[in-house]
Swiss-Prot record:
Classification via Pfam families: PseudoU_synth_1
NCBIfam families: hisT_truA (TIGR00071)
SUPFAM superfamilies, A to Z: Pseudouridine synthase
Presence of keyword Transport: no
Subunit organization: Homodimer.
Residues annotated for substrate binding in this entry: Y110
Record protein name field: tRNA pseudouridine synthase A
Residues at the catalytic site: D52 (nucleophile)
Catalytic activity: uridine(38/39/40) in tRNA = pseudouridine(38/39/40) in tRNA
Record family assignment: Belongs to the tRNA pseudouridine synthase TruA family.
Length: 244
């Protein structure tokens, strides 16, 4: 038996998220089917992040156990010939048997892209969140800085979260603008259900003047979901990297 680790990039537009579901096309199921076609084995592909419907990944990490004799570094080449164009195995390697993509992860980095323009982009409509309002970018930057550190993020999680604790540590946060694209990045030891999208939705309300930047600490301390902004759409969100 061998343990193979994959680093995966995918466009989540046409998938009902990562995790297998009955009667729905998912990223996990699509890759598992490709592995079965390659090795004849029915495997359980473990993903580091269970991304939602429409969310993309630049660096999803997954692993599976196999009895196949295919060298670990050749799985990427073989699987890419079998997978659809919107899923790419960027890297594959054999790892220790105790490696677990989800439970061994020490942190993750996410990116959210906003297309800030009067009119939407036909080419970027599934890869960015279109916002036509003029944004107060400096206020959004100030607001973003308040998320750094260790906090109880109850105000920034959707109902249905199975997490035992809502305390998380954010180690890095940035907000940059290049022409019409606003890029938000955030890294931390873990994220609650929809946490990144709710943070982005809150920053958007700062940008249009509905929430003041200096209100963010109060919203965090309130631990009340209704105090934060709405959940930003899935199409602008990317899983960038998983840390081990």
């Amino acid at each position: 038996m061998r343990n193979v680790k994959l680093i995966i990039e995918y466009d989540g537009t046409n998938y009902h998220g990562w995790q297998k579901q009955k009667n729905a096309k998912t990223v996990q199921d699509t890759i598992e089917r490709a592995i079965k076609g390659l090795t004849g084995e029915k495997v359980d592909l473990i993903g580091a992040s269970r991304t939602d419907f429409g969310v993309h990944a630049l660096g999803q990490v997954a692993n599976f156990i196999t009895n196949s004799g295919i060298p670990g570094d050749r799985f990427s080449y073989a699987l890419n010939r079998m997978l659809p164009d919107d899923i790419v195995i960027k890297e594959s390697q054999e790892v220790d048997m105790d490696f677990h993509a989800r439970y061994k992860a020490k942190g993750k980095r996410y990116r959210y892209l906003i297309y800030n323009s009067q009119f939407p982009s036909a080419l970027l409509r599934h890869r960015t969140y279109h916002v036509s309002h003029k944004l107060d970018f400096e206020s959004m930057q100030r607001a973003a800085s308040y998320f750094l550190g260790t906090h109880d993020f109850s105000a920034f999680r959707s109902s249905g979260s199975s997490a035992k604790t809502s305390v998380r540590t954010i180690t890095d946060v940035s907000l940059e603008r290049e022409d019409k694209i606003v890029k938000f990045e955030i890294a931390g030891d873990g994220f609650l259900y929809n946490m990144v999208r709710i943070i982005v939705g809150t920053l958007m309300e700062v940008g249009i003047g509905k929430i003041r930047a200096d209100e963010i600490p109060q919203i965090i301390e309130s631990r009340k979901r209704k105090r934060a902004g709405r959940t930003a759409p899935a199409e602008g969100l990317y899983l960038v990297e998983v840390y081990y």
